[in-house]
C-alpha cells in the first residue's frame, strides 16, 4: 500500500515546518557535480562530511517511519541492479523541505525532500526518483568527471558547500562562497550535464523494472516537473534547474519504460 496514513501525515507535517527549513537552508542538489576526480574512499568521506554538516543545521529529519519507508524502496532497487551488483551501502535521509527535490551525494548518501513524497501519486513515482539518484552514485558521475580540479582541496570544497547550505537565504553569503579562489568553481561542481541525467534515467528505469516497480513511474513524475516548468516560467524552482524535464526527456523515458511492459 502506498504511503501509510501516518507516513503521509508526517510528510504533510514536514511541509508545514517553519521558514527556517525553507529559506535559511537551501541544500544544493548534488546528483552529478562535474570536474572532480575522487577515489571511492574520498567519495565516502565527502558524502559523510556533508551529511554531518546537514545534521548540524537540523536539515535532516529523524523520522524513523518515513526514513525506513524510503530505505526499503531504495534497498530493493539496489538489490535488483544487475549492472552494479556491488553498490555502495546506500543511506537515505528525509530532508525538511516542502519543495520537490532529491539529491545524491558521493558515497551513497541520498537525500529526499518531504515535498517529493507529498507530490508523488504512487510508490513507483517515488521509486523513479530514488532509482535516478542511486544511478548517479553507481555510475560515479562525480569520480568519472575529469578536469583541472582533480587535485583540488576536498576539505575546502566541503566548506564552500556548508557555507552555501547555511547562507542560501542570504545572496551575499552565497556569492561570497562562490567567489573564493579555493572554491573550485562551485557552480560547475553542482551543475547537471544532460548526458549524466539521461544515463541516470536509463539505468534507473532498468533497475525499477527489475525490482518490480512500474518503470512508467519515472516518466509520470517527469510530467509533474514539466507542469511546474509551465507554472513557474522563467523562475524555475531548484529541482528544475538541476533536473530539467523537457518533452524529449519525458518521451525517451516513456519509450524506454514501455520496452519493459506494464508492472
Where are each of the predicted segments found?
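Bacterial N-terminal signal peptides that target proteins for export
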Residues: 1-8
Amino acid at each position: 500500500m502506498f504511503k501509510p496514513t501516518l507516513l503521509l501525515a508526517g510528510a504533510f507535517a514536514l511541509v508545514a515546518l517553519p521558514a527556517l527549513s525553507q529559506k535559511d537552508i537551501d541544500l544544493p542538489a548534488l546528483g552529478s557535480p562535474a570536474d572532480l576526480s575522487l577515489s571511492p574512499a574520498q567519495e565516502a568521506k565527502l558524502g559523510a562530511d556533508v551529511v554531518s554538516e546537514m545534521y548540524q543545521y537540523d536539515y535532516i529529519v529523524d523520522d524513523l517511519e518515513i526514513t525506513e519507508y524510503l530505505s526499503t524502496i531504495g534497498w530493493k532497487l539496489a538489490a535488483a541492479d544487475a549492472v552494479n551488483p556491488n553498490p555502495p551501502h546506500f543511506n537515505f535521509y528525509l530532508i525538511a523541505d516542502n519543495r520537490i527535490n532529491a539529491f545524491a551525494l558521493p558515497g551513497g548518501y541520498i537525500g529526499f525532500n518531504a515535498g517529493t513524497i507529498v507530490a508523488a501519486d504512487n510508490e513507483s513515482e517515488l521509486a523513479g526518483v530514488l532509482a535516478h539518484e542511486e544511478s548517479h552514485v553507481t555510475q560515479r558521475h562525480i569520480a568519472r568527471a575529469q578536469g583541472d580540479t582533480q587535485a583540488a582541496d576536498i576539505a575546502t570544497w566541503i566548506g564552500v558547500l556548508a557555507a552555501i547550505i547555511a547562507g542560501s537565504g542570504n545572496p551575499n553569503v552565497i556569492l561570497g562562497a562562490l567567489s573564493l579562489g579555493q572554491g573550485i568553481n562551485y557552480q560547475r561542481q553542482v551543475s547537471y550535464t544532460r548526458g549524466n541525467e539521461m544515463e541516470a534515467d536509463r539505468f534507473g528505469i532498468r533497475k525499477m523494472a527489475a525490482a518490480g516497480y512500474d518503470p512508467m513511474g519515472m516518466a509520470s513524475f517527469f510530467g509533474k516537473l514539466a507542469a511546474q516548468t509551465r507554472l513557474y516560467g522563467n523562475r524555475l524552482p531548484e529541482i528544475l534547474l538541476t533536473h530539467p524535464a523537457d518533452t524529449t526527456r519525458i518521451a525517451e523515458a516513456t519509450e524506454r519504460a514501455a520496452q519493459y511492459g506494464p508492472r
